[in-house]
């Protein structure tokens, strides 16, 4: 396929047009009074959202050169979303500002490589200054504020702070669609896995159809139990203690299952059997997690252990186990705290080295089950369109909150960027590097300018007053008042602000140093096939 090639100013200006189209679409959503963007879907109702990365991913331009520019900005939004989970619109606004100012200087004859060095130095200084201005987040109220700012809902802020308090910072918080119109929080404490009882005759509460076991022993094995004789000596020993038993095995079938059920119905023995969670290597890892949590041992041939030789010492224990037809919850396992902490550390290191998103997600789930529990925010709304929009907002808020706990917070609403202007301006640079620094200085003003414009105020007036205000004082675009931003709860996570700036500078620098762009030529439309004369019949 033939290629179109553009050079120098032609190449850069075509890409800048794409940058502007995408950024102008996304930046209308910035701030407390930002607007929504409606995205057409190939099927179903349109998606209404103010989520920067969702909008950026949908934009596809007809001109190949413009599309490359748009895709590079979309990459900034995606990368920021991957690292910090929020701040995608801010990153887009910063990218546009750096590109716009940079192109002016490159066109005027400045060396793009020198400008790039200046931009990199200025951004590194700004990031250090942001970190120096950060305030750690530890209490529930601060977490609720971060989530409320990101989601634009105090109620959502309360749900997220409550969820993080109950399951911990490493805990899994999932967002699901509610069957009703109300949004609610559901917390499952302890370890839960998606396997229910193998027979409904094992339930202890016929009304709720659940089996509750108090202070049970837990037999954990990756073997299939078909012959009751294999575990009979163990069952006899447990029977003497009058305690219930939970069996977690590859499967329980053959004569073993009806024998266990019969003893349960007769009241001889309270036992519940469930299948082991997961598949393959993941199943072995999850069984090991359960064993460590409950202080038991996995009966497996890998360790040279047989069921017939199992003793009570090899069994796990917990204060309570609840089993329904779909899931099992183990509460307060008797495992040693040190062993659990070591296992958590191992899983954390596996998460860091995992390359696949799926593997990371599954490891994160295992980590949560070991270290606290699982919280589910069930999102309710009147229409499907509103539901999708609300889910996106809550996901952003959850990511922003985790980022805040990790690296602390700074004043929100674009104030933090203006607060570091003096530090960046003090850099002793010369020539094109000084030009690069000045480009960053101008770009740092852009988020607050856009927030003010979206709220109906004059951006330049707001910036001038902000520069002359004390550090921490900022403009509340929602009310038009000047307030102490952190006290007013208008805050941004440091991780979000620094990621937005670093990613914007990285991609903008690449665009400025571009000297040639190669794109595929659009294929000409194939002509319609000529009609076969023999098919014209009696028309002649």
Curated annotation (Swiss-Prot):
ATP binds at residues 29-32, 86-90, 413, 476-478, 492. It catalyses: ATP + H2O + a folded polypeptide = ADP + phosphate + an unfolded polypeptide. GO terms for biological process: protein refolding. InterPro entries: Chaperonin_Cpn60_CS, Cpn60/GroEL, Cpn60/GroEL/TCP-1, GroEL-like_apical_dom_sf, GROEL-like_equatorial_sf, TCP-1-like_intermed_sf. NCBIfam families: GroEL, PRK00013.1, PRK12849.1, PRK12850.1, PRK12851.1. Together with its co-chaperonin GroES, plays an essential role in assisting protein folding. The GroEL-GroES system forms a nano-cage that allows encapsulation of the non-native substrate proteins and provides a physical environment optimized to promote and accelerate protein folding. This is Chaperonin GroEL. The gene is groEL.
């Amino acid at each position: 396929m033939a290629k179109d090639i553009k050079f120098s100013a032609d190449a850069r200006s075509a890409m800048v047009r794409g940058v502007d189209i995408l950024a102008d679409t996304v930046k209308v959503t910035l701030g407390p009074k930002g607007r929504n963007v409606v995205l057409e879907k190939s099927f179903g109702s349109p998606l209404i959202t103010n989520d920067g990365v969702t909008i950026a991913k949908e934009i596809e331009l007809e001109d190949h050169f413009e599309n490359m520019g748009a895709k590079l900005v979309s990459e900034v939004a995606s990368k920021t979303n991957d690292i910090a989970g929020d701040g995608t619109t801010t990153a887009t606004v910063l990218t546009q500002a750096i590109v716009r100012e940079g192109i002016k200087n490159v066109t005027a004859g400045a060396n793009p490589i020198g400008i790039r060095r200046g931009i990199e130095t200025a951004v590194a200084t700004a990031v250090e200054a942001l970190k120096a201005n950060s305030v750690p987040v530890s209490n529930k109220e601060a977490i609720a504020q971060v989530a409320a700012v990101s989601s634009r809902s105090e109620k959502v802020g309360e749900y997220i702070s409550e969820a993080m308090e109950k399951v911990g910072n490493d805990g899994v918080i999932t967002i699901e669609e509610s069957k009703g119109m109300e949004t609610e929080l559901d917390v499952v404490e302890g370890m839960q896995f998606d396997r229910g009882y193998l027979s409904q005759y094992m339930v202890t509460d016929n009304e709720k159809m659940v089996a509750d076991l108090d202070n049970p022993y837990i037999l954990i094995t990756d073997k299939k139990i078909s012959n009751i004789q294999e575990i009979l000596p163990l069952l006899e020993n447990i029977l003497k203690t009058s305690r219930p038993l939970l069996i977690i095995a590859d499967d329980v079938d053959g004569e073993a299952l009806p024998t266990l059920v019969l003893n349960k119905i007769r009241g001889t023995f309270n036992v519940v059997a469930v299948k082991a969670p997961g598949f393959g290597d993941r199943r072995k890892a999850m069984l090991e997690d359960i064993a460590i949590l409950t202080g038991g041992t996995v009966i497996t041939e890998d360790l040279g252990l047989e069921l017939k030789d199992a003793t009570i010492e090899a069994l796990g224990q917990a204060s309570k186990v609840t089993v329904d037809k779909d899931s099992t919850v183990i509460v307060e396992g008797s495992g040693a705290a040190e062993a659990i902490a070591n296992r958590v550390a191992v899983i954390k290191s596996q998460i860091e080295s995992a390359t696949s998103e799926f593997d990371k997600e599954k490891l994160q789930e295992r980590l949560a089950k070991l270290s606290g529990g699982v919280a589910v925010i069930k999102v309710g709304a009147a229409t499907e369109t509103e539901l999708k929009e609300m889910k996106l907002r809550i996901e952003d808020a959850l990511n922003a909150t985790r980022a805040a706990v990790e690296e602390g917070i700074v004043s929100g609403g674009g104030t933090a960027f203006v607060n570091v202007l003096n530090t960046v301006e003090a850099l002793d640079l010369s020539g094109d590097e000084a030009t690069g620094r000045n480009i960053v200085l101008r770009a740092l003003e852009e988020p607050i300018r856009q927030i003010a414009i979206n709220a109906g105020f004059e951006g330049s007036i707001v910036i001038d007053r902000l520069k002359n205000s004390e550090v921490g004082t900022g403009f509340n675009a929602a009310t038009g008042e000047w307030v102490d931003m952190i006290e007013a709860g208008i805050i941004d996570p440091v991780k979000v602000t620094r990621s937005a700036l670093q990613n914007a500078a990285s991609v903008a620098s690449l665009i400025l140093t571009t000297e040639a762009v190669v794109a595929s030529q659009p294929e000409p439309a194939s002509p319609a096939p000529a009609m076969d004369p023999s098919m014209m019949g009696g028309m002649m």
